[in-house]
UniProtKB/Swiss-Prot annotation:
NCBIfam families: moaA (TIGR02666). This is GTP 3',8-cyclase. It comes from Bacillus anthracis (strain CDC 684 / NRRL 3495). HAMAP family: MoaA_B. Residues 8-227 form the Radical SAM core domain. Pfam families: Fer4_12, Mob_synth_C, Radical_SAM.
Length: 338
């Protein structure tokens, strides 16, 4: 019988997102703006981030508590040296049923074959525009679109399942919604639109910059009619729509206008080993200290279970009602991978 660990709102622990680095080769303005994360920014030193042994150990502990799906994140996870070896090790952990990776795609062409051989079956690529100048601006002048598209193609050629994530910001890239939808419909990859969220502390988020799920769907539906379809599984964050008369689909992740806190089953481990129970958390619990002490697996398991049992995060549900309250500092998305 599979273990089930529930929080105070009866949400099970099923998914673990593991950040393997806090570094990124992009400077996307909603995530790691150049003016904050510049040449003098102090990233974690190698001795501060979890080793592969520690990541494998913590994975086994979370699996014993009910986790079945892993997602490797960053920063940009493909900057972590030897990542295919980690994927291979995690793929052998008894109880792990699925491993995914989120990447900006700029290094994917190089690593796709080794990642697939290691057991990585699916990848999510962040891509906010197909327009060259706009994409270059949005990523902090770090990469051209073609480099990312070549990475997507390389992943497809080795057999990976691919999803594309587009963060939509009013006044920045909402004019690219239709072009993105058409392109990835033709290329048979699922495109997911993400409402611009108030993650971290430095992106200057304002509600007026959010393009809502309904606006996105209406815009596409006028040109390529859509119909809503059922979720693949309980707790899926994206609302799914298929193109009428086609097998292709899109998804919309609506953390702002139609939150899904009630079904959130995700825990997040930062690169230095802190456990966060919400994407918008203001503080985490230090598991690295336990991993590097004389704590046994059983003792760490008890600590993690207690943290999850006491979880009652529902930030997105409360966002608008708390809009006039003083904002608490939040963990940076670049630190825990979204």
């Amino acid at each position: 019988m599979k273990s089930v660990t529930l929080d105070k709102l009866q949400r099970p622990l099923k998914d673990l997102r593991i950040s393997v680095t806090d570094r990124c080769n992009f400077r996307c303005r909603y995530c790691m703006p150049e003016e904050i994360f510049g040449p003098d920014y102090s990233f974690l030193s190698n001795d501060k981030i979890l080793s592969f042994d520690e990541i494998e150990r913590i994975t086994r502990i979370f699996v014993s508590l009910g986790v079945r799906k892993l997602r490797i994140t960053g920063g940009e996870p493909l900057l972590r040296r030897g990542l295919p070896q980690l994927i291979e090790r995690l793929n052998k952990v008894d109880g792990v049923e699925d491993i995914g990776l989120t990447t900006n795609g700029s290094l994917l062409k190089k690593f796709a074959p080794d990642l697939y051989k290691a057991g990585l079956s699916r990848v999510t690529v962040s891509l906010d525009s197909l327009e060259e100048e706009r994409f270059f601006y949005l990523n902090g002048n770090r990469s051209k679109v073609q480099r990312v598209l070549e990475g997507i193609q390389a992943a497809a050629e080795v057999g990976m399942k691919i999803k594309i994530n587009m963060v939509v910001q009013k006044g920045k890239n909402e004019q690219d919604i239709l072009q993105m939808a058409q392109y990835f419909k033709e290329n048979k990859h699922i495109l997911r639109f993400i409402e611009y969220m108030d993650v971290g502390n430095y992106n200057g988020w304002e509600l007026k910059e959010v393009v809502s799920k309904q606006e996105i769907v209406d815009m596409i539906h006028q040109v390529m009619p859509l119909e809503r379809i059922e979720a693949n599984y309980a707790g899926e964050v994206a609302t799914r729509y298929s193109y009428i008369g086609s097998d292709e689909e899109i998804g919309v992740i609506s953390s702002v206008t139609d939150s899904f806190c009630s079904s959130c089953t995700r825990a997040r481990i930062s690169a230095e080993g802190k456990l966060y129970t919400c994407l918008f958390a203001s503080k985490g619990n230090d598991l690295r200290e336990l991993l590097r002490s004389d704590y046994t697996d059983e003792e760490i398991t008890d600590v993690v279970r207690d943290i999850w049992n006491n979880r009652e995060d529902r930030y997105s549900d409360e966002r608008l009602s708390n809009s006039n309250k003083k904002a608490m500092p939040k963990i940076e998305m670049s630190h825990i991978g979204g």
